[in-house]
Regions:
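Flexible, glycine/small-residue-enriched loop-and-beta-strand segment within the central core
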Residues: 1-84
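C-terminal segments of enzyme domains that contribute to small-molecule binding surfaces
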Residues: 44-80, 109-154
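Conserved G/P- and acidic residue-centered "switch" motifs that form tight phosphate/ATP-binding loops
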Residues: 90, 108
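Conserved sequence/active-site signature of Rossmann-fold short-chain dehydrogenase/reductase
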Residues: 44, 95-96
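Internal alpha/beta core interface subdomains
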Residues: 86-89, 95, 143
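HATPase_c (GHKL) ATP-binding subdomain of two-component histidine kinases
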Residues: 98, 107
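Conserved catalytic segment of ABC-fold P-loop ATPases
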Residues: 85-88, 101-103
Length: 154
């Protein structure tokens, strides 16, 4: 039930259902991609934190986890050993070197959180921290910001 573009390499990785991988993406060993993840064209997963040509570090591959429904934009780079949260959204060209919260909108080099995204892919109109609620105009889902964490109310 997955879709893979041209020039896609898959190592010993675990890939869920309904994942869409665009052209020119390499998915190395120890990467876990949960269901409904989107990997944009030419996005990059790294597998060794401190590579050197003269040193074999194949036994040092770090685990990277991409949670359910996340979007990884075109040409973004994920440094190995991190977790990308459920329904988070990584902007095109971002360099991500730390864990990402669920529903977070991440952009820049190095990447930082600039907002929140809904499951529909709509920007959630709440600040990065505080106590607020927002209703998605497309789905009617309610999102609640509690401190620095956003939750979808079911």
């Amino acid at each position: 039930n997955c879709s893979f573009g041209q020039n896609v390499y898959i190592g010993k990785a675990k890939i869920g259902n309904f994942v869409k991988v665009q052209n020119n993406v390499s998915i190395y060993d120890n990467i876990i991609i949960e269901d409904y993840v989107f990997c944009g064209p030419s996005m990059v997963f790294t597998n060794v934190y401190n590579p050197r040509s003269a040193i074999n570090r194949k036994n040092e591959y770090k685990h990277t986890i991409i949670r359910y429904g996340a979007t990884l934009g075109a040409n973004c780079t994920l440094v190995c050993g991190i977790e990308i949260g459920t329904f988070s959204f990584i902007a095109a060209g971002a360099l991500v070197n730390r864990n990402v919260k669920p529903y977070a909108l991440i952009a820049g080099t190095p990447a930082r959180q600039i907002g929140w995204m809904s499951t529909y892919g709509e920007r959630v109109d709440v600040p990065l921290s505080g106590n607020e609620e927002w209703e998605c105009p497309h789905t009617g889902e309610i999102y609640k910001l509690e401190g620095e964490d956003l939750k979808r109310l079911i």
